[in-house]
Amino acid sequence: MKDKTINTKSFNFKRFSIYGGQSGMPVSTDGVLLGSWINLAPESLVLDIGTGTGLLALMAAQRFEDALISAIDIDQHAIDAATVNIEQSPWQDRISLHHDSVLTTDFSQRFDAIICNPPYFNSGEQAQQSQRATARHTDSLDHLQLAQRCFEITTDAATASFILPTPEGEGFIKLAEQCGWYLAKRLDVKTTDKKPASRILFELSKDPVCGQDLQRESLTIHHQGGYSEAFIALTKDFYLKM
């Protein structure tokens, strides 16, 4: 039987490179946006859920020099690629990898922050390429279970940051609020000025005060045939040509 596994495209950033291997998770604008946007408290203990090739963990390590990051993924191909990327980075001493499910892992301590680019296909046929399907289909990580688990394994002062397409993001926020989370920050992302927002980046908090003082902003990626000044300012520490 022919092996249908597809090698995943690699990508170079200013201070690290991402080897895709057979992870099924090529570098995406979504991941770069989230990694550039998150905010972490000093000396945070961070969990990157569904790390894929390790992109978010590496971005967090670059931006926050005293953060300790655990990165978890259920897929062995993802862990294999992430291992290469982390070992070749300047921050391998601050990132640990775990091949397991976040839903069943017994963590030894609670986290100060969650970062996650979660799956979002709620219906329809899964992609033929199996790793890609697993990475993007909510059958492998239900949003309600994810929100609840994030609440359980974090400290009282913790934050949890995600990026999702707008409809799925709206739904996730409602589910998270049922679990005790409050929406603290939100960034609505448009590809161009003429299109509606296609992505939501959002930060959840356990503090009710944050829910009463929502910080909401918007960002347009492309402007007049190039990248917008706001997008460049957000991502310039990572993209080579910014």
Curated annotation (Swiss-Prot):
The EC number(s) this enzyme carries: 2.1.1.223
GO molecular function, one term: nucleic acid binding
Key words of the record: Cytoplasm, Methyltransferase, S-adenosyl-L-methionine, Transferase, tRNA processing
Catalytic activity: adenosine(37) in tRNA1(Val) + S-adenosyl-L-methionine = N(6)-methyladenosine(37) in tRNA1(Val) + S-adenosyl-L-homocysteine + H(+)
UniProt KW Methyltransferase keyword: yes
Short name of one Pfam family: MTS
The protein's role, per its UniProt record: Specifically methylates the adenine in position 37 of tRNA(1)(Val) (anticodon cmo5UAC).
Record-given protein name: tRNA1(Val) (adenine(37)-N6)-methyltransferase
Source organism of the structure: Vibrio atlanticus (strain LGP32) (Vibrio splendidus (strain Mel32))
